[in-house]
Structure formats: structure tokens, C-alpha cells
Amino acid sequence: MADLSNERVVYINGEIVPESRAMVSFRDRSFKYGDGAFDMTRTFGHRIFKLDEHLKRFYKSLKYLQMDPGMSLEKMKEISEEVLARNLHLLNEGEDYWVAQRVSRGVEPVGGDIHEAAEPTVVVECTPLPFKARAHYFRDGMEIVIPSTRRT
């Protein structure tokens, strides 16, 4: 069995698993139709920044989309903090994470009604902030393109 002490873990659908074992079905509505919502915040000094505010906004978005995450805001907060805690040992001093919560309506039944209720897909994960890889953007700036076609 592989040594997983150097692999980040992720919460997915009720379990905390190594990232290498975290799978989302290709039939998940978020993959097929973009039918999902997410929120992301970062850590400062290994603490999640304004998590309560982010989760309130996230749950407001879920309500607007009529998407039930299958858990309370308090439970999502608890999971977010646990996932972070289980991944902190992988950071060096001065490094931090993005912490993301993602919810979709889940996997729709093949040949079924697209409005049929499914179990939501819920993911909470941490990704290291790429400070070193992006330092040159802060130092040198970056080119951008502004399309002439305006969207409303």
C-alpha cells in the first residue's frame, strides 16, 4: 500500500479520502451541464479567511439554484476545517491553501427525468496557493485581451 502521508486528502460525498481516490462520475450534472456551485477562500497563517461569510454566501447561491447540499452550513464549516487540518502538515512555513467547497445536483439517472432528485455531489478540498509560480505576474504584470464583443 502506498504511503499517503504525503498526499492531500479531500472530502467527497461523506468520506475523507486521498486525492488519488477522489472520483466524480462523468454523468455528474456539474460535469455534463455546469449544474453546480462553488466557493473558495484562502488561508492566512493556516487559518481559513472569513469562512463564515463565504459559507453564508455559498448557501445563498445554493438556495437561489434550488440545490440542497444535504448538510447544514455548520456541518460544511466543520468539514472544511477538518479537511484543512488534515492537510496542514504538507505545507511549509509561509505557505497557505485555497479551500474550496463544491456542490452539484449529483448524477442523473440514465434515461430518467433530469428533474428527478439525485444525491448531491459534495466536495471540499485544499489546493496550495502557487505564490512562487505566479510571483513574476506580481513583479512584471501580465498581458490581457479584452474582446470587442460585449456581453450583458
Residue ranges of predicted features:
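Conserved alpha/beta cores of soluble small-molecule-handling proteins
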Residues: 1-152
